[in-house]
Amino acid sequence: MRNTWKSRQLANRSVLRVSAAILFALTVLVLWGLSEGRAMGVLDRLVLFSEVHGTVLKAGAPVEGAELIQKVVWSDDADKNPTQHTVTDKDGVFAFPAIERNAGLLRLIPAQPTIQQTILIRYQGVEFVAWLHGKGSYNANTELDGRPFRLVCELTRQPDYEGKHYGICRAV
């Protein structure tokens, strides 16, 4: 009886030590992630598509009423892949807010994200590939190496590569 009690007591102490070590490690990770001077903390949100501002032109003239569709593919679950829509104003101007998600445990897992970004433009029954890009970071504004995301999309332009992205839009 006495050996069984001692064995349980030793087992309980081992479990407590392991639990304390795990709690300590998680606390250190959270504090490290929240510390200033780091680009992204453990609890920061994941930026799947940075804020976008742009203008749609046709032969250099602003296009009013063009529909823009912004898509992100970052998960095998289609319900987790967001889509946003907007329409250009009289000056051909459009904007999309950033698409962000909660980090959850993803910040603790060392991995290279693969995020497929797409912007399509629909105008007068024609669909144009405005922007295709493979984003490899959860940080904001990494699409254009830290610059704000500003585009000029010329509908008469043939889609082509510009840096790491493809489409009719040029970064300005």
Where are these regions (language model features)?
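Beta-strand-dominated extracellular/periplasmic modules and repeats
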Residues: 38-149
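N-terminal secretory signal peptides that target proteins for export/translocation
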Residues: 1-14
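Bacterial N-terminal signal peptides
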Residues: 21-32
